[in-house]
């Protein structure tokens, strides 16, 4: 059993038959797909289209953060035991002397709450970072993006720290490219100590 996103991207839709063709290769056969979550459709008027409304994790890499909601989650833990429960997510960046910063959003920024000024983007976000597509008041707001790469020997995992190397830093309105092996932290509002790691 594996998790997958349409076109391996938060924004996007894909027929299950096409996904099975794409995910089948020598030694690995994808033969069916189950809609494991609700997702954004045109009638919801929530964006990006195709984005799961709950959480999604693949091989220790968060595609969409689990959010406290009225529905529970189905998952398989590291010991291959099924878990059905409500789950929440909170990430932490420990920047040493520059401080510790918490974030709750992965790949889909939100601007409608006090804790929404920090978003983590990875390869599942699509080709570029983005602004909150559901809160037009945030369009055009300057932001700071800091690009991170896993340190040598590290791999993504949940419920455990990972060490990253800080790369470039950009200050603009977002929409910057995301490379497959690079992640971006985006901070809206005034740049704080996190942005000068």
Annotate the PLM regions.
Residues 1-197:
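Gly/Ser/Thr/Pro-rich low-complexity, intrinsically disordered segments
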């Amino acid at each position: 059993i594996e998790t997958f996103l349409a076109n391996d991207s938060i924004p996007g839709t894909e027929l299950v038959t096409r996904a099975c063709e794409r995910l089948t290769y020598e030694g690995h056969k994808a033969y069916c797909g189950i809609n494991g979550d609700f997702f954004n459709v045109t009638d919801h008027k929530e964006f990006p289209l195709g984005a799961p409304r709950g959480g999604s994790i693949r091989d220790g890499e968060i595609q969409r953060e689990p959010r406290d909601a009225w529905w529970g989650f189905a998952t398989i833990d590291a010991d291959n035991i099924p878990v059905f429960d409500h789950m929440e997510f909170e990430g932490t960046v420990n920047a040493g002397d520059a401080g510790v910063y918490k974030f709750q959003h992965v790949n889909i920024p939100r601007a409608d709450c006090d804790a929404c000024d920090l978003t983590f983007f990875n390869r599942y976000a699509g080709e570029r970072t983005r602004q909150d597509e559901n809160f037009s008041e945030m369009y055009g707001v300057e932001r700071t993006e800091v690009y991170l790469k896993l340190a040598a020997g590290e791999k993504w995992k949940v419920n455990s720290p990972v060490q990253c190397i800080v790369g470039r830093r950009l200050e603009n309105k977002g929409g910057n490219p995301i490379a497959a092996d690079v992640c971006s932290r985006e901070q809206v509002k005034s740049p704080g100590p996190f942005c000068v790691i």
